[in-house]
């Protein structure tokens, strides 16, 4: 049972960190796109709703990052609350990955479903 729990926790931690990577990738693609693309003779980033969506993406990504860093620290020191911290990091990061990727698709519009942009 101990080996199984160890493997499950490592899997959860890996899932959390992978989800954080997905968040970062979606933010990077969206940032490049909204800085370059123009709509109504203005860059997308100058529109309030775009700024709001992007700020939300950054906030969710940062939250996932902090949870993953905290879980890594607990894991490294074998802190008694390590399992709970890993579970919380997995929850926050995986939820953020879904939300951030969805917002990236929204910001890219029809291009968000195109394979060249890799956010879907």
What are these regions (language model features)?
Residues 6-120:
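Alpha-helical interface subdomain recognition
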Residues 1-3:
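Long, acidic (Asp/Glu-rich), low-complexity accessory segments flanking structured domains
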């Amino acid at each position: 049972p101990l080996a199984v729990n160890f493997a499950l926790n490592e899997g959860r931690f890996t899932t959390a960190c992978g989800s954080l990577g997905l968040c970062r990738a979606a933010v990077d693609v969206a940032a490049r796109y909204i800085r370059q693309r123009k709509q109504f003779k203005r860059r997308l980033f100058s529109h309030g709703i775009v700024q709001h969506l992007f700020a939300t993406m950054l906030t969710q990504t940062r939250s996932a990052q902090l949870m993953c860093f905290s879980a890594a620290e607990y894991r490294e020191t074998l802190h008694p609350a390590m399992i709970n911290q890993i579970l919380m990091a997995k929850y926050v990061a995986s939820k953020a990955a879904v939300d951030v990727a969805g917002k990236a698709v929204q910001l890219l519009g029809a291009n968000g479903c195109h394979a060249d942009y890799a956010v879907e």
